[in-house]
Amino acid sequence: MEMLTKFESRSSRAKGVAFHPTQPWILTSLHNGRIQLWDYRMGTLLDRFDGHDGPVRGIAFHPTQPLFVSGGDDYKVNVWNYKSRKLLFSLCGHMDYVRVCTFHHEYPWILSCSDDQTIRIWNWQSRNCIAILTGHSHYVMCAAFHPSEDLIVSASLDQTVRVWDISGLRMKNAAPVSMSLEDQLAQAHNSISNDLFGSTDAIVKFVLEGHDRGVNWCAFHPTLPLILSAGDDRLVKLWRMTASKAWEVDTCRGHFNNVSCCLFHPHQELILSASEDKTIRVWDLNRRTAVQTFRRDNDRFWFITVHPKLNLFAAAHDSGVMVFKLERERPAHALNINTLLYVNKEKSIVSYDLLRAQSTTVASVKHLGSAWLPPRSLSYNPAEKVALLTSSADNGVYELVNVSSRSNSLPLKDNIKGPGDDAIFVARNRFAVFSRSDQTIEIKDLSNKVTKTIQLPEKTRDIFFAGMGHVLLSTATQVHLFDLQQKKIVSSFNANRVKYVVWSNDNSQAALLGKHYVYIVKKNLELITSIHETIRIKSAVWVENNVLLYATLDHLKYALMSGDTGVIKTLESTLYLVKAKGNMVFALNRAAEPVSFEIDPTEYLFKLALLRKDYEQVLHLIQNSNLVGQAIIAYLQKKGYPEIALQFVEDPSTRFELALECGNLETALELARTIDRPEVWSRLASDAMSYGNHKIAEITFQKLRYFEKLSFLYLITGNAEKLQKMAIIAEKRNDTLSLFQNSLYLNEVESRINILEQAGMYPIAYLTAKSNGLEEKAQQILSHCNKTEEEIKLPSLGSAFTTPVPVNETYTHNWPLLDTSHSTFEKSLQERMEQLAIERQEEQESEEEYEEVEQSLMDVVDEMSDLAESVPEEEVDGWEVEDLAPEEAVNDVVDDASAFVGADEIFLWKRNSPLAADHIAAGDFESAMKILNKQVGAINFSPLKTRFLEIYTASRVYLPTISGLDPLVSYVRRNAETAERSQALPFITRNLASIKSHELHEAYRLVKANKILEAQICFRSIIYLALTTVANSEEEADEISALIDECCRYIVALSCELERRRLGEEDTKRALELSYYFASADLQPMHSIIALRLAINASHKLKNYKSASFLGNKLLQLAESGPAAEAANRAITLGDRNPHDAFEIEYDPHVEMRICPKTLTPVYSGDDFDVCSVCGAVYHKGYVNEVCTVCDVGGIGQKGTGRRFFA
């Protein structure tokens, strides 16, 4: 038996201590008059209470209420509320020191005893004294309620122990009952008698005499009819009582000074006593012999108490308080696959099947060590079916037990014993025995013969298993991996006082458990991560090689190899984990009983999937688990996954911050409209400009009415039309400065002059007119000012002020960004979230509402309304129907290459590449057109003009020189890493990744928003960009070609939808055919779902149930759940009930077909047809050499060598 100290405080002399029934708190009453509240787990002082004058002796918590009572030398019994930290009231009545005070376990009573030779019972609710027990002739040192009966025991310096019967008091204070007249008269008579001769509410039942000197303490046994007493005669006496008598059983002798306090062990047949001889002694209740003595050098013990529920004791002494327990409560156990071997409280080895929940006793180890000390550890050898147990009794002993037979619980005769502090198996037929005193390890065989003795190189505290032929040596500051064959340390790791080691399933990692830390290391003791806890760590178990579950006193937690930790659940009691599999955890409790419970592993599985970059698992957990909470959101932000955190948040402000963090400006815009606060719009404007998204920046500036910033934005993006509107707005606002600024941006000279005249700034107006050659206007200003030209001395005037003319309509595009490589998870997540958005939209709209939306979207998009008015809900995105050329055309730079410095490089560009884009960059537009005509049969190049100029401009950098000289030209290469000029190739702006992340994303968005015309224009622009793009590999070239084919499919499909909307109710049969053609197109899943649902709705209206059923089956393949799946199932059900079509239409779903863009009719695989080599559109015969209506570039039926994007 050993004293395991859990907490110790340092203070002045402590006279009393009390455990809280549920919280890890103790109250200590000090001799200096102060009361302290401690958290004994954390070792922290929580509060102090001052209210007594003089020493405080009695202290006790209430069992259920937030109250405690204290009694001191100021004769007061104080009742406190520890939550409000206030003294509620004082109970006055005692005439001398109050020694003990305590609460009744059931009634609102407080029991107190005093040096005034009385015992008082108080009702703390009514704050009255309800009984005074007199009879002792000296100080009453102790009084206590019986745990279950209506009895009180008291001890006094009059050398007696008295037992009081308070059943009368209980009946008197019980709930009132109806009584007859006779009972009422009898009660009145008794009341008169009590006034004359004293109360009979509490009467002395027994007077126990046996002590030779004063009695300091007495206590009832929790369950047996026993009483314990201790006194100044240095004896601890045991008494037994019955209903009619009480007598002394025996005396425990051994203390050599006054015994201050004593108690019964609540769970074992032991007695504990505390004495002024500076010892705490443990006695055998049955034999009344001393079991163990715990001594302090300088502190006398004054009080000892036990926790009402846990196996903890607290003792008050001269230097403070200590909390301790007498034995380790961790059951010795070992796991072999699904079989758990453990030692129960009866010291028998039990084999427990975790899957079947069946237990079998296989051996007994009652004779191992001391009767009061359970085995400390168990090591199991599954090959030989033997177990090795160790105990700390007798300076360390081990026992080798055969557990293969299913015999009775009697000890086996062939058990082998020997001295040793630790013993573990290190091979199939070898085990190691560690001696702490000798610092040696003996290797023994199963017959207990020593085969090898190893002297350890370091002072070792414990040894642990570390694989066959290896052990871990735990020292005070380090852990060593020790090779038993080579007798040397292989590797070391700095860790203080490692208590337990838990190996992973494949023995590749280990968790080193200390008192407050966990170190996770590799097999060679290389650190992976470390975890620190403020509460003691009790056990750990591996779920798999990357997840560790560990238990503290209060919680079950997890740890990942990245160092991430979290709480899985709160534990009602301390558990020792033995195995975890899936969502089941198996453990042993402190009663050495196996328990199992379910956990929710979603949180650590989610984090583990992120750690492994298993995005499919992450997506699955998001869709099927209830992952919520600020902790998950903060974790995702910390780990750099704001786009995932965005899916968990509902609060608009938090979603807005996350959207900005992950660069999702479209979502941020929607949220800004919801929040609608100036600071939010300002944040969005700043981020939009940082990302080069001038379209969203324009919306934010409109919302904030930043007119100057809007004007400048339109200037740098070349949007002259909106600059003109800004000038009109400035005029309406009477903002002269803004109007002048916009006239500068627009280069409107006459407007500037008029503004300056209106402002009375005639000199500047005159200079402006003269410098821009407006002589007539200059003369008008002079005449208005009564001046002549001779009177004015003009400075030398420079050239007229002009604004640059934009080469490209840059306001139609946002600034291009580098495309990040989207993971499988991000793509799946984006597609899934867009699908959910479509489904929610379809849930909210009825068919009639959807038709109204369709009708409204058939019209051409109106021009932007006056910017001074409120901003519309959504800006018109996409390409304009007509491309307006700038007022001043850009001069074509197709001069003779020999006239330029560096013309050799341009020649090399054309020589090194057969691609049209490289010839465009060289300035040889004619050669590029010939290449496109030869490769893809292009015949109409006017739509490519803007793209040609863009490529040409982006391949050069012009450096201005001194006035009068032409600028220096520097050519930009895409293979700048190549040193040889002979292999130079020009830089081609806009690659595949850029097109996908901007134009293609925008086109998808327009389709989703039901903006059909804009979407067609956007897809057509993608064809122009892709046709003159250069690939970095053959694979990328194939992707570009596939992108052109996809754009062609979208344009033809959207043409069918536009034609159907134009027809309306004129030709319902033709409209139904067009809806089928739209639904049969190979589109993205989210767009195909919309098309199929529209076609199903149209089929139901015209009673084509058979065709609707076929479309329903296709829809069900794309949408397995949600409203779309419900609509598909309804269509299939109606088709099964009525498998007929009311209209015969030109549509065969079982034959492969393409749609002719000219006639919007099917072209089946067996028909004659012509193809556009540019976009791949298929036409009926009869349109050869006409311009393709899909791409507007290629010639129908023109032959070419094929698309080429990689050289």
UniProtKB/Swiss-Prot annotation:
Phosphoserine occurs at: 409, 942
The listed locations are: Cytoplasm; Golgi apparatus membrane
SMART domains attached here? WD40 (SM00320)
Q: Which UniProt keywords apply?
A: Cytoplasm, ER-Golgi transport, Golgi apparatus, Membrane, Phosphoprotein, Protein transport, Repeat, Transport, WD repeat
* Per-repeat ranges for WD: 9-50, 51-90, 93-134, 135-174, 210-249, 254-293, 296-336, 370-411
One Pfam family, please name it.
WD40
GO molecular function (one): structural molecule activity
Entry-linked InterPro entries: Beta-prop_COPA/B_2nd (IPR006692), Coatomer_alpha_WD-assoc_reg (IPR047312), Coatomer_asu (IPR016391), Coatomer_asu_C (IPR010714), Coatomer_complex_subunit (IPR050844), G-protein_beta_WD-40_rep (IPR020472), TPR_COPA_B (IPR056176), WD40/YVTN_repeat-like_dom_sf (IPR015943)
What biological-process terms (Gene Ontology) are attached? endoplasmic reticulum to Golgi vesicle-mediated transport; intra-Golgi vesicle-mediated transport; intracellular protein transport; retrograde vesicle-mediated transport, Golgi to endoplasmic reticulum
The record's annotation in CDD domains points to: Coatomer_WDAD_alpha, WD40
This protein's GO cellular component annotations are:
COPI vesicle coat; cytoplasm; Golgi apparatus; Golgi membrane
Q: Which membrane topology describes this protein?
A: Peripheral membrane protein
Per the entry, what this protein does is: The coatomer is a cytosolic protein complex that binds to dilysine motifs and reversibly associates with Golgi non-clathrin-coated vesicles, which further mediate biosynthetic protein transport from the ER, via the Golgi up to the trans Golgi network. Coatomer complex is required for budding from Golgi membranes, and is essential for the retrograde Golgi-to-ER transport of dilysine-tagged proteins.
For this protein, the record's PANTHER family field holds: COATOMER, COATOMER SUBUNIT ALPHA
- Quaternary state and partners of this protein? Oligomeric complex that consists of at least the alpha, beta, beta', gamma, delta, epsilon and zeta subunits.
Q: What is this protein called?
A: Putative coatomer subunit alpha
Q: What is the lineage of its organism?
A: Eukaryota, Fungi, Dikarya, Ascomycota, Taphrinomycotina
